[in-house]
Amino acid sequence: MDFSRNLYDIGEQLDSEDLASLKFLSLDYIPQRKQEPIKDALMLFQRLQEKRMLEESNLSFLKELLFRINRLDLLITYLNTRKEEMERELQTPGRAQISAYRVMLYQISEEVSRSELRSFKFLLQEEISKCKLDDDMNLLDIFIEMEKRVILGEGKLDILKRVCAQINKSLLKIINDYEEFSKERSSSLEGSPDEFSNGEELCGVMTISDSPREQDSESQTLDKVYQMKSKPRGYCLIINNHNFAKAREKVPKLHSIRDRNGTHLDAGALTTTFEELHFEIKPHDDCTVEQIYEILKIYQLMDHSNMDCFICCILSHGDKGIIYGTDGQEAPIYELTSQFTGLKCPSLAGKPKVFFIQACQGDNYQKGIPVETDSEEQPYLEMDLSSPQTRYIPDEADFLLGMATVNNCVSYRNPAEGTWYIQSLCQSLRERCPRGDDILTILTEVNYEVSNKDDKKNMGKQMPQPTFTLRKKLVFPSD
């Protein structure tokens, strides 16, 4: 069943109370003023899509919403996710996208009876005028009104506690549990990065193009270095797709997609480079999407306890946010990287998971000074286009993704030389790893080298962009 049909079917089965709950739990992403026009679940889904909180390749927020409002039937039927899976997922720190504060308020609203709701309104008359507390207001509406008046917030729970104590002391336990959780979380986040062995920090996804101020705020977590002593350091998968005859035959929109001539040069460069850096190379050529998932599943289930790192390189065609298998089927990049979260691959928890992706993803040019492209008209260079704000890696520590290009811009492949990105990456790794440079320093140099190349025919340029949630410096010793 396709993505839109799934959302439609889910929306049709959510009543007005469900919608009110979903809107409340989404307040940190869609402000109350912008929620006012939302009259049904489909409109809410549309707003979430606009905020990039709901995508075909990333249903985690929708799953969490349905789990929180206890619509487990929809979770199982349409999203193929069981309650136990969600419980395990949300127990991993940093994975929950709905704040503990908002979940706490929602839990209170679920425990308050109609008579207690009337008492709630009566006891708040000093803080909120009676005309605002009309008969139709539910407790979630009251919480929103309290937040507007700044008498309720993550650090403002006194009035709520006073009212709950008068109405039903069991409600206080929900608040106390939240406060205890907040204290534990605060104290744990003040600890050393070494205290987290399985990606358990609350971490944001960063890119090298983030502002200096944002990077400075994270710099302390990079002061230490990931352990890199095992030999081999880890597995290095190289999924190298060249022959797209199946795609041309089976997928009408890809009838003119070209074979990726020259990709063997990239695969060879990656093999030589990472062998020198003591990785065990695992090559896989001309893989369908199903085969790619099967390969990743094999390495997800492997025991990496004696390894210090994992690398996966994918060389293929693609489109916005996805890569193509040789059969023309699509694999969302986020789904590929997410195969190696701490929950799915515990033996890699706390260890760096590195992905390098060279994939043709469109036909737009980044304007600059004027090489040719491996599109239908040009036989030489491949064009990569990424979707704006597309999510590529999990919101979990220890991931790094090197994409060949920034959003909405092409990348280039020369059949006689390989791609600008992979060739520059391998050259920089071979030159700078023996000096002890860390991977972000190296990728910054790759950005510089690639950005100085010109596509003179199309006036195009290319700028790679890494995205990462690394907690420490990542160095690949050559000795």
UniProtKB/Swiss-Prot annotation:
Active site positions: H317, C360
SS bonds (residue pairs): none
Outcome after substituting C360S: Abolishes interaction with UBR2
SUPFAM superfamilies named among the record's database cross-references: Caspase-like, DEATH domain
Regulation of its activity: CASP8 activity is restricted by RIPK1. Inhibited by the effector protein NleF that is produced by pathogenic E.coli; this inhibits apoptosis.
Propiece span(s): 1-216, 375-384
Classification via CDD domains: CASc, DED_Caspase_8_r1
EC number: 3.4.22.61
PTM sites of type Phosphotyrosine: Y334, Y380
InterPro entries per record: Caspase-8_DED1, Caspase-like_dom_sf, Caspase_cys_AS, Caspase_his_AS, DEATH-like_dom_sf, DED_dom, Pept_C14_caspase, Pept_C14_p10
UniProt remark on domains: The catalytic domain is sufficient for recruitment to lamellipodia but catalytic activity is not necessary.
Quaternary context: Heterotetramer that consists of two anti-parallel arranged heterodimers, each one formed by a 18 kDa (p18) and a 10 kDa (p10) subunit. Component of the death-induced signaling complex (DISC) composed of cell surface receptor FAS/CD95 or TNFRSF1A, adapter protein FADD and the CASP8 protease; recruitment of CASP8 to the complex is required for processing of CASP8 into the p18 and p10 subunits. Component of the AIM2 PANoptosome complex, a multiprotein complex that drives inflammatory cell death (PANoptosis). Interacts with CFLAR and PEA15. Interacts with TNFAIP8L2. Interacts with CASP8AP2.
Entry's family note: Belongs to the peptidase C14A family.
Protein name, per record: Caspase-8
Gene: CASP8
